[in-house]
Amino acid sequence: MARDYYDILGVSRSADPDELKRSYRRLARKYHPDVNKEPGAEDKFKEINKAYETLSDPQMRGRYDQFGEAGVSSAAGAGYQDFGDFGGFADIFETFFSGFGGSPQSGRRRSGPARGEDLRFDLKLKFREAVFGGEQQIRISHLESCKTCEGTGAKPGTRPQTCSTCQGSGQVRRMTRTPLGNFTQVSVCPTCNGQGQVVTEKCDSCGGRGQNQVSKKLQIKIPAGVDTGTRLRVSNEGDAGQKGGPPGDLYVYLFVQEDSEFRRDGTNVLSEFKISYLQAILGAQLPVKTVDGEETITIPAGTQPGTVLTLENHGVPRLGNPVSRGDHLITVIIDIPNRISTEERELLVQLASIRAEQTGKGGIEGFLGGIFGR
């Protein structure tokens, strides 16, 4: 399965356009083929480009957030972006070394509200459920803010204290001397785990975590036309945020089960339909199964094996535009019997004589071969 575009760019799903651009430029500098000659760098560069091209467009980003790659136009491609504003090698050098020092405020970890983690749920659908959509009830388990301590983790009547090790910054710094100069190494505070605060009297309900694991049922709306790999976003149903931060989202990944009668090719439904050799020769009006139910199909006289008949607008609705549907393509399979009655054989021999066909050693098979080999 393809990697998540947000993970490729190393940003959260709530990242604003400026944050997306900064991350994109940083990664593009790192993996640009003119700079990075390592194997796989060019493929990584194209992957970064595709992710940014999708997420930098508000409309495409919205479709990606809702449906994943299935909702994004295939035109969002892996072409190179314009690098005219990168500032050359000096800019790349500056980017590379910016993580080793610089302003005391650079890379400062915020100890304030933090968004909750996103969650994933895999959901299996039957073929027709994927075609027409509908609603599915699922049960998930996620973290919710503790109602007793209101998410602080502290016992009611008390409050978290500022960490004395990092003075509330969530980070500790260490100066390192190198031949290139002095550099400041920044790491997460081991006392408060980067939170900037410590809980001295823990809440009895959540054990000081500020969150509890809760199981709940959700009603999920499945759009018509989804397929394996389609991803649906359910806002605010991920894990609860910390310190009043917003909850994450729930991402439902869909997997469509195989069907005994139908297959799918894009928005077209494919199936096979077996008819007798007489129906193929004479033609017929026959009932055939479709995803919409039973329909009548016309078999033209002289239909050949492997003929594909089309039922228009009986395919899969287009994702996001259910009014538009594909077609149902039916491949005709002609059933030639291994055994026939004496009466049938006599009649077929007469037909062969009328057509001046030679039955040959195989008997009537020569006649049938003459018909179906045209």
UniProtKB/Swiss-Prot annotation:
Give the record's cofactor note, including how many are bound: Binds 2 Zn(2+) ions per monomer.
Q: Where does Zn(2+) 2 bind?
A: C163, C166, C189, C192
Binding sites annotated in the UniProt record for Zn(2+) 1? C146, C149, C203, C206
InterPro entries of this UniProt entry? DnaJ, DnaJ_C, DnaJ_domain, DnaJ_domain_CS, HSP40/DnaJ_pept-bd, HSP_DnaJ_Cys-rich_dom, HSP_DnaJ_Cys-rich_dom_sf, J_dom_sf
Q: Which family does it belong to?
A: Belongs to the DnaJ family.
Per the entry's comment, what about the domains?
Answer: The J domain is necessary and sufficient to stimulate DnaK ATPase activity. Zinc center 1 plays an important role in the autonomous, DnaK-independent chaperone activity of DnaJ. Zinc center 2 is essential for interaction with DnaK and for DnaJ activity.
Instruction: Supply the name of the protein.
Output: Chaperone protein DnaJ
> Origin organism of this chain?
Acaryochloris marina (strain MBIC 11017)
Lineage, highest ranks first: Bacteria, Bacillati, Cyanobacteriota, Cyanophyceae, Acaryochloridales
